[in-house]
A protein has these predicted regions:
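N-terminal positively charged helical leader segments and presequences
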Residues: 1-89
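Short glycine-rich anion-binding loops that position phosphate/pyrophosphate groups of nucleotides
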Residues: 33, 54-56, 83, 102-104, ...
């Protein structure tokens, strides 16, 4: 059992809470039973799993630990409660924290089915919002989520947490805006941009064909280049005083409108 806060592996985990270290070491953190379970189900390779039985909250936690330990490439280490508290990113942890290699998440690896449904996030600033978007995208059955803002860190531990691990269960890609626009054009994927000043309501857009729902920043919206690239611009109606709604809520509304339209489509 690791009991020293000065242990090299403990220090590495603490470093990985910072983006620059995640990027330089090409490793990231996964904390929590549900999140680690979904990572394992998605065949994410676990390099190390740190456990603190004192914090276990589920009767089947040890089963997951044994499942990870069965991988010859994974190291499982028990740690003291003080050490785990030092490494943990969240409050009320359930005693499991894993280190895994950062995925490439390339656009070229993303499958494009006929009439695919995608979501493009151009500037989601808050990890909690991005995690919620991923969770909604998973629930709506999207074919992929594309993140194209250099300032957005998909591997932030709070993104993983807010997504409830669904970041591992749906296809995700990261690329610069120009590459994303070329990719969408190459695959004939229509761009439906969410813009508060659009003339049309979101329910008027045809989301039954291959399309990508485009979301910008809550504060500044979509930039000129993205607006010029959009095939359709739509807004969510608002009868209150707020000039915009939370970007994750907007994503959820539009994704489930797309799902509703597709469900009503007659099958061939």
């Amino acid at each position: 059992m690791i009991t020293s806060l000065q242990n090299a592996r403990v220090k590495q985990v603490v470093r990985l809470r910072q983006r620059r270290h995640r990027e330089s070491e090409r490793l990231f953190l996964i904390e929590g039973y549900r999140e680690i379970q979904r990572a394992v189900e998605a065949s994410v390779r676990i390099h190390a799993l740190f456990t603190c039985e004192q914090f276990f909250s589920r009767s089947d936690t040890k089963d997951l630990v044994r499942q990870v330990a069965a991988d010859v490439d994974a190291t499982v280490e028990a740690v003291s409660s003080a050490v785990f508290a030092k490494m943990s990113v969240r409050d009320g942890s359930d005693g499991l924290l894993a280190v895994a290699p950062s995925p490439a998440w390339s656009l070229g690896d993303m499958t494009v089915p006929a009439n695919g449904l995608f979501l493009v996030s151009t500037a989601t600033e808050k990890p909690g919002n991005l995690g919620t978007i991923l969770r909604s995208a998973d629930a709506a059955g999207v074919d992929g989520v594309v993140v194209c803002s250099a300032g957005t860190d998909v591997l932030n531990p709070n993104v993983v947490r807010a997504s409830l691990g669904t970041v591992f269960s749906i296809p995700v890609a990261r690329a610069d805006p120009d590459s994303v626009r070329l990719w969408l054009k190459h695959h004939t994927i229509r761009i439906i941009a969410a813009a508060p000043d659009a003339d049309r309501l979101y329910i008027e857009a045809d989301m039954t064909r291959s399309c990508a729902i485009l979301l910008g920043s809550e504060h500044t919206g979509l930039d000129i280049e993205w607006m010029a690239s959009a095939d359709d611009r739509v807004r969510l109606p608002s009868v209150g005083h707020a000039d915009s709604i939370n970007v994750a809520m907007a994503a959820t509304v539009m994704l489930f409108e797309a799902r509703r339209q597709r469900r009503l489509q007659p099958s061939d």
